[in-house]
Amino acid sequence: MASGSAGKPTGEAASPAPGSAVGGASSQPRKRLVSICDHCKGKMQLVADLLLLSSEARPVLFEGPASPGAGAESFEQCRDTIIARTKGLSILTHDVQSQLNMGRFGEAGDSLVELGDLVVSLTECSAHAAYLAAVATPGAQPAQPGLVDRYRVTRCRHEVEQGCAVLRATPLADMTPQLLLEVSQGLSRNLKFLTDACALASDKSRDRFSREQFKLGVKCMSTSASALLACVREVKAAPSELARSRCALFSGPLVQAVSALVGFATEPQFLGRAAAVSTEGKAVQTAILGGAMSVVSACVLLTQCLRDLAQHPDGSAKMSDHRERLRNSACAVSEGCTLLSQALRERSSPRTLPPVNSNSVN
């Protein structure tokens, strides 16, 4: 399904929450906020690159490799869900500003995690709505699914990379049992999705080499994962610099194995066929994707402003400039939400529509 509950992260590739624990000691809320900013920014940019900047029209699936597909939802349902989520985004944007102004960096970090998940969810829904609107135009031919969903497996790869980056970058003193648990669970969740998706692709593949290569890729990934998770268990049971360094050492092979598997799985022959749409359909799709991009760009800017504020002491000469940038980026988020809502209602770009009550000119 394309929506799910408003404001709730979707799918199994959701963040393993390194941002919720990195540097997570309560005495270091600024450090934690900086880490969350980096994670959220990377996630939002990746999803935008995959769904908004692509020239292809494809449905967006959220429930896993065996999902019946997001196409069960109508454009109208997607539109209403997205508009509801823009309202939730406005509330979170206000909350983050207020918490930061009061010096509540821990609460601001929690709100930012929620904001990042909401932006990802909103982007997914917007991309699916754009697809539905495009294929509803005359002469359009719907997309044909392939053996692999490029978006889902690429998201999983990114989450695995993020989890391994946390293990490499976190000092021993900050490797709390909670952090190690969250990273381990996140890695396991995403690796399971990749395993299931590639097993399904192997079963459905008609090519003998592809069937075997999917299986070998999964085996390689699973072996690397077992070696890394054993190191994580060891650093949890008997913390030491040696145990921590082993986590960093064995994270490399897992990242490489996942990258190789996803690289193979996303070769063109496994991805099906994008929808064929007319010029009219392309214009409708571009309008909605452009509205969503306005929201994502503003939220990325907001995240960068939060990061800058977290890194400077309150008495810093640049503090007032950073706060002004934060206010401006919050306004940009609001404007982006308005543009997206208009694009969904009009099925055209609000930037090219005549102003309300304007007189036409020849």
From Swiss-Prot:
Q: Entry's Pfam families?
A: Talin_IBS2B
Its quaternary organisation is: May homodimerize. Interacts with F-actin.
Q: In which domain of life is the source organism classified?
A: Eukaryota
Q: What does this protein do?
A: Actin-binding protein which may have an oncogenic function and regulates cell proliferation, migration and invasion in cancer cells.
Q: Which organism is it from?
A: Mus musculus
**Molecular function GO terms recorded:** actin binding; identical protein binding
Alphabetized InterPro entries for the sequence: Talin_IBS2B, TLNRD1
Name of the protein in its database record: Talin rod domain-containing protein 1
Modified positions (N-acetylalanine) in chain numbering: 2
Region annotation (Disordered) maps to 1-27
Bias category Low complexity: which stretches?
A: 9-27
